[in-house]
């Protein structure tokens, strides 16, 4: 018996759509990351990108627990002296709700070019509409 090693020809990617209404941010992000990496497939290989495409709609209605809306802060730096910018989760949800989920999933993916390729398969939209109807995405049930 030989050990099976997947090749790029063996990869079968599917499209899924997730409605993020009233789902908790971190719990949703872990389920999405699991699918993006392909860890739910029996032919998973850590050195290959064999995950599925995920379309997330209604990201503006996502929930968080505790006082994270006011307390959680996101930081970015322009590269200049004194160029540190911070924004709270509440303000980021009001202005760019899709970035909240993208940041959460990005933190759970590998920090290399494979992780960047996996993140490109995540499509996040604030409202209920998405332009990926031609791919016929199947609804994905989130466990919790």
Swiss-Prot record:
Signal sequence annotation: none
Gene Ontology CC entries for this record: cytosolic large ribosomal subunit
Family: Belongs to the universal ribosomal protein uL13 family.
Role: This protein is one of the early assembly proteins of the 50S ribosomal subunit, although it is not seen to bind rRNA by itself. It is important during the early stages of 50S assembly.
Protein name as catalogued: Large ribosomal subunit protein uL13
GO molecular function, one term: structural constituent of ribosome
Pfam families with a match to the protein in the record: Ribosomal_L13
Swiss-Prot/TrEMBL keywords: Ribonucleoprotein, Ribosomal protein
Coiled-coil regions listed in the entry: none
Keyword rRNA-binding recorded: no
Subunit structure: Part of the 50S ribosomal subunit.
S-S pairs: none
GO biological process: negative regulation of translation; translation
Gene that this sequence comes from: rplM
